[in-house]
């Protein structure tokens, strides 16, 4: 597991080495576990406070290429 970004010192965007398809990241912390698709940029599973989710989705969109590159290294 690799923490890629922190939001408000309570939440983390994580890329997990041993994870299932499709490519995605997890938004975790403060009782939240949301899966965000790297292919579509939308929430696959879970819920989070609106402002936190908006910030996470914007960060994932801005870093999508590098996240997908790392995902593909871990999941050849």
Predicted regions and their residues:
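Hydrophobic N-terminal alpha-helices or hydrophobic patches in metabolic proteins across all domains
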Residues: 5-8, 58-59
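Short, solvent-exposed secondary-structure boundary motifs
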Residues: 3-6, 25-27
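Intrinsically disordered, low-complexity and often Lys/Arg-enriched segments
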Residues: 1-2, 76
């Amino acid at each position: 597991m690799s923490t890629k970004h922190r939001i408000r010192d309570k939440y983390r965007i994580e890329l997990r080495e041993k994870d299932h398809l499709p490519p995605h990241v997890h938004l975790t912390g403060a009782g939240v576990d949301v899966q965000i698709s790297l292919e579509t940029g939308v929430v696959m599973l879970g819920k989070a406070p609106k402002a936190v989710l908006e910030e996470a989705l914007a960060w994932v969109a801005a870093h999508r290429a590098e996240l997908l590159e790392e995902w593909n290294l871990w999941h050849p």
